[in-house]
Structure formats: structure tokens, C-alpha cells
Amino acid sequence: MSDNKMSIEFVSKSENEAFARVAVAAFVAQLDPTIDEINDVKTAVSEAVTNSIIHGYENREDGLVRIEAEINEDQVTIAIIDKGIGIDNIEQAMEPLYTSRPDLERSGMGFTVMETFMDALEVDSEKGNGTKVVIKKKFNVVS
């Protein structure tokens, strides 16, 4: 049983990436994180949401991105879910400089960033059926 849950869904517009960061940061705030911890979470969420918009929906603004977050004791689990084109080869996509959009001036898909800032990263994807990225972080909660 979780201590708290939330979910939000928004259209795949790049402007909504900032909304996603703030919404998740507000939810995680109940764990009394440090500034660095909250920035880590915001950065990881930003990377995952940006991937959904740019790579999953190829910048189409008619897709939906869903975020589900859950707090269990001192850990937050955040799932970023899209129904975009999916990832052909997850292992290749997780390489630091790999991108499915070499036409854009970006340096990879951000999975290395997510791994750096979070305690756990799981990616589940099916070509043509979308992607689910799950990130987790533990906090030093003082009782």
C-alpha cells in the first residue's frame, strides 16, 4: 500500500514539459527533499517527458503523456508513459550519445542523465505501442 499517489496527463506539446517538472516537484516536496534532490527529480522527469514528445510522438502535438507518481515511505516512483512509436532497441537507445532524431541538435536521449540523478531506471517499450520509463529515488526522511 502506498503512502500517496498522483497522476496527470497532458498533450505532447513541448510547453508542457515545464508543467510536468513543477507538478512532480510539488508532489515530491512532501518528502522534504534538499534543493539538489528536487533538482535531480525535475531533471530526470524533464528528460523522460522530452523523450516522449520528441522521440515518441515525433513532435506531434496530438499525443498524450501520462505521469504516475507514488510515494512509499522514503521512496518516490515515477512512471512517464506515452503511446508513441516506441523504441526499437532499448539497449542502443540507452547509449550516451544515441538519438533517434540525428536531425535535431541534441546529444542523446537522456537515459544516462536519468541514471545519474535517480537511484533506479527501467525502460519498457514496444515498437508501435509506446514507452514506459520508471524512475525511482530514495530520500533521507527525518521523522
UniProtKB/Swiss-Prot annotation:
Q: Tell me which family the UniProt entry assigns to this protein.
A: Belongs to the anti-sigma-factor family.
Recorded GO molecular functions are:
ATP binding; protein serine kinase activity; protein serine/threonine kinase activity; sigma factor antagonist activity
Name of the coding gene: spoIIAB
- Keyword check for ATP-binding: yes
- Protein function: Binds to sigma F and blocks its ability to form an RNA polymerase holoenzyme (E-sigma F). Phosphorylates SpoIIAA on a serine residue. This phosphorylation may enable SpoIIAA to act as an anti-anti-sigma factor that counteracts SpoIIAB and thus releases sigma F from inhibition.
Q: Which organism is it from?
A: Clostridium beijerinckii (strain ATCC 51743 / NCIMB 8052) (Clostridium acetobutylicum)
Task: Keywords in alphabetical order, please.
Answer: ATP-binding, Kinase, Nucleotide-binding, Serine/threonine-protein kinase, Sporulation, Transferase
Give the protein's recorded name: Anti-sigma F factor
Specify the domain of life of the species encoding this protein.
Answer: Bacteria
What Enzyme Commission number(s) does the record list for this chain?
2.7.11.1
Please cite one Gene Ontology biological process associated with this protein: sporulation resulting in formation of a cellular spore
Show the PANTHER family listed in the entry.
ANTI-SIGMA-F FACTOR RSBW (PTHR35526:SF3), ANTI-SIGMA-F FACTOR RSBW-RELATED (PTHR35526)
Kindly state which reaction or reactions the protein catalyses: L-seryl-[protein] + ATP = O-phospho-L-seryl-[protein] + ADP + H(+); L-threonyl-[protein] + ATP = O-phospho-L-threonyl-[protein] + ADP + H(+)
